[in-house]
Each structure stands twice: as C-alpha cells, then as structure tokens.
Amino acid sequence: MTDLAGTTRLLRAQGVTAPAGFRAAGVAAGIKASGALDLALVFNEGPDYAAAGVFTRNQVKAAPVLWTQQVLTTGRLRAVILNSGGANACTGPAGFADTHATAEAVAAALSDWGTETGAIEVAVCSTGLIGDRLPMDKLLAGVAHVVHEMHGGLVGGDEAAHAIMTTDNVPKQVALHHHDNWTVGGMAKGAGMLAPSLATMLCVLTTDAAAEPAALERALRRAAAATFDRLDIDGSCSTNDTVLLLSSGASEIPPAQADLDEAVLRVCDDLCAQLQADAEGVTKRVTVTVTGAATEDDALVAARQIARDSLVKTALFGSDPNWGRVLAAVGMAPITLDPDRISVSFNGAAVCVHGVGAPGAREVDLSDADIDITVDLGVGDGQARIRTTDLSHAYVEENSAYSS
C-alpha cells in the first residue's frame, strides 16, 4: 500500500511488530491438547523500555495479574510472555510461584540469547480455564523455543496473535501508522466473559514513539475507559484481564500527548470492534446509545442495563424489534427517569416515542448483522455508548461445555 504524505493509516494486517524495535513469536508448547499455538512472546529491543498497564477490577485476580502489577511499578518492560490454554487463576501460592518461574525462565532465555534481562522486566499473562495449574514442564520448554523463534517482521506478530486465542475464531491485531512517522500496534484476544473492567482480554500494545511511563499510562487509561470498559457481552468479568502498552522509542520521535492519546484510542477502538465481532456465539453486533440522560454516568448505567438484559439480547437474536423489552430494561436502571419522555429507535427507525409505540414499530427490519439501539431519556444532556451482542443458541452451547 502506498503511503501518502500527511496521512495516518490503520492496518489490520499488522500488529505488535509493526512499530520499530519489537520482535514477537508464537509457538505450540503443548499446553493446549489440540496442538495449536499456545505460547506467545513480545520482546522490546529498545532503546527505551517504558511501559504501562491496566488490569481487571475483579477482586479475584489470577497469579499473572498479581505478578505483572508488581512488575509495572517500575514503569519498565522488556518482554511479555503470554499463554493460552490455562488461566493460572485460583491456584494459590503454587500458581504464583509458577508465574515467577515463567518470568525467570524468559529472563534467562533472553539473557542467553544476548540481551541481559531480569525477571522484574518480564510481564506474564495467561488465559483459559480457571482453577487448574499450568503444565510447567511444557511451558518452560516452550519458553526456550519461543525466544529462538522471534521475528522482527510482521510474521512474528501474526503468530503471537494466533497463540493467545482461546475460544476466539480469528486473531485480532491492528497497527496505526502516524503521519509523523511513528507507529502504534496491538493484538488482543477475547470472546467470552466480556464485560467492563476490560473484557476477558489479553491485549498488548506497542509503539516506537518516545514516551515516558506517565504519558503511556495516561494514554492507555483514557483509551481503555472509552473502549474496552464499554464492551459488555455477558456481564461477566474475568480474573485475568490485562492490557499492556510498551514503548521502544526506536523512532526517536516524542509525540504530543494529545497525538499519543488519539493514536492509542484508535488502536484500542479497532481491537474492541474486532472483539465484539468475534464474541462467543455472536450473530448480531449491537451498539446501545443512551442520550438525554441527567448525567453521563446515568447514561452509562442505562446503556449497560440494556446491553446485559437477556430478554433484549434474545429478541435481537431473533431479529425481533421488541422495543418493550428495551423500556422494561432501562426502567430497572437506578437513575433519574420519566417514562413519558423515553423514546427508542432501532437502526434509526422510531419504535417508541415518549413512552408509546410508534406506527410500524413491529415491522422494523433487524435482519442485518449490525443493530443500533438509541434510547433518548429526555431529561438532560448525558450520553454514553456500549457495544454488545445478541444471545444465541451457540453462546449457551459453547459456555455450557467450556470446562469439559
């Protein structure tokens, strides 16, 4: 693709290795019984190693989350090791020791490879079934393998994106090439237990922009609050949610904070849309927008209430324009409401005006895969948007058999 001067490009064919200064790899370590790729490494070659992260708000945190939160108090990372096929959550002190051993093994392998690295510079992420210990013999052998398989080109990033998948159908990655000649790349996984507080997600973002840890943290927190925290598929919140942002500084370009914020936001927003599109059992991609609320917080609460309502979600699965279920859902939200002021539209077609059904409401066509629900509460200026999906037979089937 030809680069045009003054343009910023967003490319889904690229990921964490699009920015200069990063290598990555994905290998099959044997953690998954299927033999699929299940161990990924993202390595920062520098010259800078600034980093930031945001994590699950679930009080039950997996061992890798506890480890990586400690590591990030330094504001510095050289590497991120990620496994799928096991969450290493609710595994007690032994599970934390496994995480520590993984970081030590990565540090030793990188040092042997030629880059002196300490365990305190290695973030660890895991995803999969909660409650089981990881097969450490396979994982540690895989660490040595993945270090030697690292690529600086796009292939390594693609392999890493595949290796972190669990019930995902497709890998999620994207890169933004800024017109000032610096780049932000990213990869993510997540298909079930998607809810605010990130989204059962592992996400690694990389940039070759020169930025301090505080600048990265500001950009990341703002982006996560506007994107991942507003993706709500099933109301469940994972023990393992982790989003990391690493800077190599290899471009030697220090962007303005506003430019960095915008670039990270655009990458996170695109990854969020990919997560929504590949959610478990999804047949409809749904956007719930609430306007006219007393406050933005009220709008967000109302939008979440609608997005999580099982009757709304099953109606959408059946392409049924059942606006009454939307009103019933929003009526349960603990916010300021006047039922006689509420209006609802589906895909721009009015189905309820001031609390009463609109002519032709039952004939609105919701057969397309994308559905926009807009609810105007009519009591203020607050507004918010939530991404969600329908609730299908496939979702129930997949989650009823996940551990077996």
Swiss-Prot record:
Active-site positions on this chain: T200 (nucleophile)
SUPFAM superfamilies recorded: DmpA/ArgJ-like
Keywords tagged on the record: Acyltransferase, Amino-acid biosynthesis, Arginine biosynthesis, Autocatalytic cleavage, Cytoplasm, Multifunctional enzyme, Transferase
Pathways involved: Amino-acid biosynthesis; L-arginine biosynthesis; L-ornithine and N-acetyl-L-glutamate from L-glutamate and N(2)-acetyl-L-ornithine (cyclic): step 1/1; Amino-acid biosynthesis; L-arginine biosynthesis; N(2)-acetyl-L-ornithine from L-glutamate: step 1/4
EC number of the protein: 2.3.1.35, 2.3.1.1
Reactions catalysed according to its record: N(2)-acetyl-L-ornithine + L-glutamate = N-acetyl-L-glutamate + L-ornithine; L-glutamate + acetyl-CoA = N-acetyl-L-glutamate + CoA + H(+)
Annotated InterPro entries: Arg_biosynth_ArgJ, ArgJ-like_dom_sf, ArgJ_beta_C
Enzyme class, spelled out: transferase
GO CC annotation: cytoplasm
Keyword Acyltransferase attributed: yes
Subcellular localization, as worded in the UniProt entry: Cytoplasm
UniProt-annotated binding residues for substrate: T166, K189, T200, E280, N399, S404
GO biological process, alphabetically ordered: L-arginine biosynthetic process; ornithine biosynthetic process
UniProt-annotated site: Involved in the stabilization of negative charge on the oxyanion by the formation of the oxyanion hole, residues: T127, G128
Site (Cleavage) location in chain: A199, T200
Keyword Lipoprotein: no
GO molecular function, one term: glutamate N-acetyltransferase activity
The family this protein is said to belong to: Belongs to the ArgJ family.
Subunit structure: Heterotetramer of two alpha and two beta chains.
Known role: Catalyzes two activities which are involved in the cyclic version of arginine biosynthesis: the synthesis of N-acetylglutamate from glutamate and acetyl-CoA as the acetyl donor, and of ornithine by transacetylation between N(2)-acetylornithine and glutamate.
General remark: Was identified as a high-confidence drug target.
Protein name, UniProt field: Arginine biosynthesis bifunctional protein ArgJ
Organism: Mycobacterium tuberculosis (strain ATCC 25618 / H37Rv)
